[in-house]
A protein has these predicted regions:
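Conserved, mostly hydrophobic/aromatic
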Residues: 36, 62, 70, 92, ...
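Boundary/entry segment of secreted carbohydrate-active catalytic domains
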Residues: 27-55
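Bacterial N-terminal signal peptides
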Residues: 9-17
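Bacterial N-terminal signal peptides that target proteins for export
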Residues: 1-9
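Acidic-and-aromatic substrate-binding clefts and catalytic sites of carbohydrate-active enzymes
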Residues: 42-52, 72-85, 107-121, 146-155
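Active-site acidic/histidine proton-transfer and metal-coordination neighborhood
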Residues: 91, 98, 109-167
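Hydrophobic faces of well-ordered beta-strands that scaffold small-molecule active sites
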Residues: 32-38, 70-72, 99-104, 140-142
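Catalytic domains of carbohydrate-active enzymes, especially glycoside hydrolases
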Residues: 55-75, 135-139
Length: 167
């Protein structure tokens, strides 16, 4: 009697777990959003207008590896990797990823730093920001800046970056 009761309880427990187990196996794990900075593959795709060839196969390989987004690193003269921002975005999306950010910068000239008038640099940033929006980038990262030697220069750079950020 005890053995039979034990067997029935075990069978009921197994049946109770089966639907949950089956549905859990049927569901796919959510895809993780993992991005890659394209600067890390610059030897394959080039940077700053110096193309190493067609970057589309590299984008496809990155997507096949599981990457879902990219950070570009080759903005120059309104172009990303030698393409219009719209074409670059299309190429990235055709590979199955999205452009999430880029990294680029424009350091102030000695004259701009001394005068505190960086309106020319801000005009460049306006064009840069418009291009990056067209490429689908949500963020622009400034990866580096020139060496600052005085508090006044640092304060000028702080005002400069605050102006850029407000755009």
């Amino acid at each position: 009697m005890r053995n039979r009761l034990f067997a029935v309880i075990c069978a009921l427990l197994a049946l109770a777990m089966l639907p949950g187990g089956a549905s859990a196996r049927a569901k796919k794990a959510p895809k993780k959003d993992i991005g890659i900075q394209l600067y890390s593959v610059r030897s394959l795709i080039g940077v700053f207008g110096k193309s190493q060839g067609d970057y589309k196969p590299v984008l496809k390989q990155l997507a096949d590896m599981g990457y879902t987004s990219v950070e570009a690193a080759s903005y120059k003269d309104g172009m990303l990797y030698g393409q219009t921002p719209e074409q670059f975005r299309k190429d990235v999306e055709d590979a199955g990823m999205r452009v999430i950010s880029t990294h680029c910068t424009l350091n102030l000239s000695d004259e701009e730093l001394a005068s505190g008038d960086f309106s020319k640099a801000l005009a460049w940033w306006d064009e840069c920001i418009a291009a990056h929006k067209a490429a689908g980038a949500e963020y622009i990262v400034v990866p580096s800046m020139r060496k600052i030697s005085t508090l006044k220069d640092l304060q000028t750079y702080c005002r400069y970056f605050n102006e850029v950020g407000a755009r």
